[in-house]
A protein has these predicted regions:
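Positively charged, phosphate-engaging catalytic surfaces used for nucleic-acid and nucleotide handling
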Residues: 1-164
């Protein structure tokens, strides 16, 4: 309990704790840096959604699904099934490239939303599709240049084992 109180007065402590936990689980420093950045970008997006009146819960989940389906060609549920996840966090099981493209999709959605200021949920759904499409284009180009799929069944357990 003291740790949590300390973190409330100094939020950097909670970031340090998360960093330590990821390291203990075997994640690379590079992946951890990407993951922490993805948390920041997600927070900026959800702040933007709140600003334009999107409701937490079902509406956030719907917009997240639209973004993910657009850039990854899979709903969040389909993506979790591909990676063999049950309750685990999807972002904690993305490769660096998947995380980066997800961040691009979410940051693009936030930027487009700020630019056009959607007035209702239906307009926010269109914005989510546009933001996801920015990352979809990047993903398609990367896959064409490398000959490799970006969206894979690789999960944290697999890429930590491969690192060892």
């Amino acid at each position: 309990a003291k740790e949590r109180l300390d973190e409330m007065s100094d939020p950097e402590l909670s970031i340090d704790r998360a960093l330590k936990q990821y390291l203990e689980l075997g994640y690379s420093q590079n992946w951890i840096n990407q993951r922490l950045k993805s948390i920041e970008i997600r927070k900026e997006l959800t702040d933007e959604w709140q600003r334009v009146g999107v409701k937490q819960g079902t509406e956030f989940a719907t917009l997240t699904d639209i973004i993910t389906k657009t850039w990854a060609d899979k709903t969040t549920k389909e993506y979790k099934i591909l990676k063999g996840l049950k309750k685990e966090n999807l972002r904690d099981n993305m490769t660096n490239t998947e995380l980066i493209l997800n961040m691009l999709a979410e940051a693009s959605t936030k930027d487009i939303s700020e630019a056009i200021n959607p007035s209702n949920f239906e307009e926010s759904k269109l914005v989510a599709k546009q933001g996801g499409n920015v990352a979809k284009v990047a993903r398609a180009e990367l896959e064409a240049k490398t000959g490799k799929k970006v969206v894979t069944n690789q999960n944290a357990k697999k890429f930590i084992e491969n690192k060892l």
